[in-house]
From Swiss-Prot:
Name of the protein described by the UniProt record: Glutamyl-tRNA(Gln) amidotransferase subunit E
Catalytic activity entry: L-glutamyl-tRNA(Gln) + L-glutamine + ATP + H2O = L-glutaminyl-tRNA(Gln) + L-glutamate + ADP + phosphate + H(+)
InterPro entries per record: Asn/Gln-tRNA_amidoTrfase_suB/E, Asn/Gln-tRNA_Trfase_suB/E_cat, Asn/Gln_amidotransferase, Asn/Gln_tRNA_amidoTrase-B-like, GAD-like_sf, GAD_dom, GatB_C_1, GatB_Yqey_C_2
Top-level EC class as recorded in UniProt: ligase
E.C. designation(s): 6.3.5.-
Originating species: Methanococcus maripaludis (strain DSM 14266 / JCM 13030 / NBRC 101832 / S2 / LL)
Gene Ontology, cellular component aspect: cytoplasm
Taxonomic placement: Archaea, Methanobacteriati, Methanobacteriota, Methanomada group, Methanococci
Length: 631
C-alpha cells in the first residue's frame, strides 16, 4: 500500500544482533559451535524475577514468571561447560570479541567508552540459564552512510547470545546451551529511518560493514534484526526476530497499516460509546450439548467455557488490521500468550466451527448482547480461561484508548504477533563477577591502523585485479567464500579467477539445489580440487562431479574421487586417439558434410571425454583431426 510516510510521521530504528566468529565464547573457553547431534545430558530449573539495583521489578520479566514454566537445558560434555549451566563463575571477556566490537565501532564513526562495564540484563523466559544476559556498552553516537542520507547509530553493545530453543511445551520449554555465550554485537540506530525502503537499506549497510571485518558468522540465525516502528498518534512497537533482510520493508509497511487500522477502530468505538464489561460469565451449562469439536474436547478434559461482553464491538472484532489478521487476532494473541489457551471464538465470526446459529442466539440472550455488541468465549482449564479472558478484557480496553506499546514477533508473511509488553530499564544491573575493561588510546590506534577493506573498495579491486565481471565481483564481495576466493586465486595463478569464483558462487549452489548437503564440503576439499586442476589431474568440466564426489565421500582424497567418478585426466595422446576413433566411426557423415560435421562430432566427443579432458583441448584437437580428414 502506498502511504505518505512523511505525513504519517513514520519513525523507524533498528537493532541488529550479529554473532561473531570467534575461537571461544564470550565468558568461557568453549568453542562457538552449534550442534544438532544427541546431547549428553539435561538439567531442569525454574526462574523467578528479582529487583534491579533501583528496587524495581521489570514488567516483562514479571509477565514471564506468571507463566509458571519449567526450563530444561541440554548440554554437551565436550563443547559446553559449567559456565553455560550457571554452575561456575564467568571467565574474563574474550579479547578477540572486544577487538571486533572496537573495529565495527570505528567503521561506524562511533565514540568509544573509556571503560567497559559488564551489566546483567534480566531475562527470565528461560533463554539464559542464569536468568540474565551479560552485556556491555562499548560505543555510542556514530553514523552510517546510505543512499538516503546518514543514519545515526545510538550504541554498540557486546553481549552473550542466548540458548537455542528446541521445544516449547504447555508447561515447559526445552533449550540447548550450545549457542549460549557466543559473542554477539547489538547495534542500535537512531529512529532516523523514515520509509520502509530506507529501513531495508540501513540494515543492508550495517550487514555490509559487519561482513567486511571477516569476523562474523554467516547463515540462518546468525544475524537477527529487531525493528522499532512508530507513527504520529500511534505507539512504539518493537518487532523481534526479523531474520530475512527482504522482510524488513514489508514488516514496516504492515505495521503502519496495523497502527492506522487500530486508530480507525478506536475512533469508531468511541463514536459508539463502546464499553468493556469486566464480568466473566460461566456458560459451560449453556453449551454443554454443543457439537463443536473444540468446545467438546475442552469439556471432555474437565475444562470450562466462559465468556465476556464487549458493548459496541459488533463488526469491529472481525475488522482487518493487517493482511489476513483482525482485531480478534490481536485479542486471541493476548489470550494465547498470557493464558496459554489455544484461541478464542467471537460472535463476529459465528455461527462457525461447529457452533450453530441456535447456540449463538442462546449465547447472546444469556449475555444480554445487543445488536451492536459482541461476545468472546474461551474453552479450556478454568485457570487458563480466567487468565486468557482477563488479558482480552485488558486488550479490548486498550483498543478504545489507542495502540499499546508492545514487543511483537516477526512472522514469515511480514505480519507480527504479540509477544510481551515493552521491557523497561528496570532489568539492568552491574555484573559483579567480571572486572571492567579499560580501552586505551594505544588499543584504539591499533584498531584504526588495521581497518578492513570495505566492500565497495574490494569490488573495484576484484574487477581490476581478477578480471571478474561486475555482477560476479558483487556476488564474490558479499560471499562467505570471499577470503577463500582470494587465497585460491593467488595460490593457483594458472587457473582463471572467474572459474574459481563461479565454482564457489554458482556451482556449489546448483549442487545444493539438487538436494546434496553442501555443508559437508570443506575448504580442504576445495583446496584439493583447485590443486588438481592446476596440476592437470582433471578438466574444468569435471568440477561439478568432483564436488559431488567429495560430498558423497567426505573422507576420500581427490585421486580416489577421480577414480570413483571415472574422471582421471587423460594425456594429449589419449585424447587424440579417442577423437580419431570417433571420426572414423562417423566417417560417412564426415564425407557428406565435411567441416559441417563438427557439431555432431563435438557432441559425441564430449559424451566420451567430459571431465577427462579440457573442453578447449577437445575442441582444438577435433578441429585439427577433422581438417586432416576433409583435406
Amino acid at each position: 500500500m502506498d502511504y505518505d510516510y512523511e505525513k504519517l510521521g513514520l519513525k523507524v530504528g533498528l537493532e541488529i544482533h550479529q554473532q561473531l566468529n570467534t575461537k571461544r565464547k564470550l565468558f568461557c573457553n568453549c568453542p562457538t559451535k552449534i550442534r544438532d547431534d544427541e546431547p549428553h545430558g539435561e538439567i531442569e530449573r525454574v526462574l523467578r524475577p528479582s529487583q534491579s539495583e533501583m528496587g524495581h521489578v521489570d514488567k516483562a520479566a514479571l509477565l514471564e514468571s506468571k507463566k509458571e514454566k519449567k526450563f530444561i537445558y541440554q548440554y554437551y560434555n565436550d563443547t559446553t561447560c559449567l559456565v553455560e549451566l550457571d554452575d561456575e563463575p564467568p571467565h574474563d571477556v574474550a579479547p578477540e570479541a572486544v577487538d571486533t566490537a572496537l573495529e565495527v565501532s570505528t567503521l561506524m564513526n562511533m565514540k568509544m567508552a573509556d571503560e567497559v562495564q559488564i551489566m546483567r540484563k534480566m531475562v527470565i523466559d528461560g533463554s539464559n540459564t542464569s536468568g540474565f544476559q551479560r552485556t556491555m556498552f562499548v560505543s555510542q553516537e556514530g553514523f552510517i552512510e546510505t543512499e538516503y542520507g546518514n543514519i545515526g547509530v545510538t550504541s554498540l553493545c557486546l553481549e552473550e547470545d542466548a540458548c537455542k530453543k528446541i521445544e516449547d511445551g504447555k508447561d515447559y520449554t526445552k533449550y540447548c546451551v550450545d549457542r549460549l555465550g557466543i559473542p554477539l554485537l547489538e547495534i542500535t540506530t537512531e529512529p532516523d529511518i523514515t520509509s520502509p525502503k530506507m529501513g531495508k537499506e540501513a540494515a543492508r549497510r550495517i550487514g555490509t560493514i559487519l561482513r567486511a571485518t571477516g569476523k562474523v558468522k554467516r547463515g540462518l540465525g546468525t544475524i537477527r534484526q529487531d525493528v522499532n516502528i512508530s507513527i504520529k498518534n500511534g505507539a512504539r512497537i518493537e518487532v523481534k526476530g526479523v531474520q530475512n533482510l527482504d522482510l524488513i520493508e514489508k514488516i514496516i509497511e504492515n505495521e503502519v497499516t496495523r497502527q492506522i487500522s487500530l486508530n480507525e477502530i478506536k475512533e469508531e468505538l468511541l463514536k459508539r460509546n463502546a464499553e468493556v464489561v469486566d464480568e466473566i460469565k460461566d456458560i459451560t451449562e449453556l453449551l454443554k450439548d454443543t457439537e463443536s469439536k473444540v468446545l467438546k474436547n475442552a469439556l471432555k478434559n474437565k475444562g470450562v467455557i466462559r465468556a465476556i461482553l464487549l458493548k459496541g464491538f459488533s463488526g469491529m472484532i472481525g475488522r482487518e488490521v493487517q493482511p489476513g489478521r483482525r482485531l480478534g487476532t490481536e485479542f486471541s494473541d493476548r489470550g494465547k500468550v498470557l493464558g496459554g489457551v489455544g484461541g478464542l471464538f467471537h460472535t463476529d465470526e459465528l455461527p462457525k466451527y461447529g457452533i450453530t446459529e441456535e447456540e449463538v442466539i442462546k449465547l447472546k440472550e444469556y449475555m444480554n448482547c445487543g445488536e451492536n455488541d459482541a461476545v468472546i468465549l474461551v474453552a479450556d482449564k478454568k485457570n487458563k480461561v480466567e487468565r486468557a479472558l482477563n488479558a482480552v478484557i485488558e486488550r479490548a480496553k486498550e483498543s478504545m484508548i489507542g495502540i499499546p506499546e508492545e514487543t511483537r514477533k516477526a512472522l514469515d508473511d511480514g505480519n507480527t504477533s504479540y509477544l510481551r509488553p515493552l521491557p523497561g530499564a528496570a532489568r539492568m544491573y552491574p555484573e559483579t563477577d567480571v572486572p571492567t575493561i579499560t580501552i586505551t588510546e594505544e588499543k584504539l590506534e591499533f584498531v584504526r591502523n588495521n581497518l578492513p577493506e570495505m566492500p565497495e573498495e574490494k569490488l573495484v579491486r576484484f574487477v581490476k585485479e581478477y578480471e571478474l565481471n561486475e555482477d560476479l565481483a558483487k556476488q564474490m564481495v558479499m560471499s562467505y567464500h570471499v577470503d577463500l576466493f582470494e587465497t585460491l586465486s593467488k595460490k593457483y595463478s594458472k587457473i582463471k579467477p572467474t572459474l574459481i569464483a563461479t565454482t564457489l558462487e554458482a556451482t556449489i549452489k546448483e549442487i545444493k539445489r539438487e538436494g546434496l548437503d553442501t555443508d559437508l564440503l570443506t575448504e580442504e576439499h576445495l583446496e584439493e580440487l583447485f590443486n588438481g586442476l592446476s596440476e592437470d589431474k582433471m578438466s574444468k568440466e569435471a568440477v561439478p562431479d568432483v564436488i559431488k564426489g567429495f560430498i558423497e565421500n567426505p573422507t576420500k582424497k581427490l585421486d580416489e574421487i577421480l577414480e570413483i567418478k571415472g574422471m582421471s585426466s587423460m594425456s594429449v595422446e589419449e585424447v587424440e586417439s579417442i577423437i580419431e576413433d570417433i571420426i572414423n566411426q562417423n566417417i560417412s557423415q564426415v564425407n557428406e558434410k565435411g567441416m559441417g560435421a563438427m557439431g555432431l562430432l563435438m557432441g559425441r566427443c564430449m559424451a566420451q571425454l567430459r571431465g577427462k579432458a579440457d573442453g578447449k583441448l577437445i575442441n582444438t584437437t577435433l578441429q585439427k583431426k577433422l581438417k586432416e580428414k576433409v583435406q
